[in-house]
Amino acid sequence: MSRYRGAVVRIIRRLGELPGLTRKTTRRNSRPGQHGDQPRKPSEYAIRLEEKQKLRFNYGLTEKQLLRYVKDAKRIKGSTGEALLQLLEMRLDNIVFRLGMAPTIPAARQLVNHGHICVNAKRVSIPSYQCQTTDVISVRNNARSKQLVENYLSFPGLANIPSHLEIDKEKLVGKVNGIIERDWVALQLNELLIVEYYSRKG
């Protein structure tokens, strides 16, 4: 399944606020579609599927990518759900977003793809690059790159930078000081239901 490129508003009407995907919000409580206003009790499968979709759309992942992250999280000692979130939060496109260098993860992904971002002084153009503690995230030393990020920093997607990150806005340099704590994950979801979803699929 490829990455979603359709109408963002339909997604947030169905799944709720997705801060990584878009700044847009919707006041309508009903789901999209002809029968969106008809109340119905979702099945347990539907609830687990919805939580999985929240995660996939927020971080801009394909189904194949998310499945790989779930498998990687299961190999990590401790809570699989929390490990999954930590892996996703350490993606370079997400780190750029959480530092305020881009208003959304898709915008951050574009910065990375176009070569505007460096990790430890080396240009990295892979959005899924897995950042490590002590990594230094900087902006490529040219006028175009700096102008883009300076504009984004004036209107960050999220108000607060997580405690495991820091940024020098004048130098356009950020640093990863550790692993994100669960409370700092901006997306509202139950990650245990996602682990259950994949466990039941076998």
From Swiss-Prot:
Keywords: Chloroplast, Plastid, Ribonucleoprotein, Ribosomal protein, RNA-binding, rRNA-binding. It is found in: Plastid, Chloroplast. PROSITE patterns: RIBOSOMAL_S4 (PS00632), S4 (PS50889). Residues 90-152 form the S4 RNA-binding domain. GO terms for molecular function: rRNA binding; structural constituent of ribosome. Part of the 30S ribosomal subunit. Contacts protein S5. The interaction surface between S4 and S5 is involved in control of translational fidelity. This is Small ribosomal subunit protein uS4c. The gene is rps4.
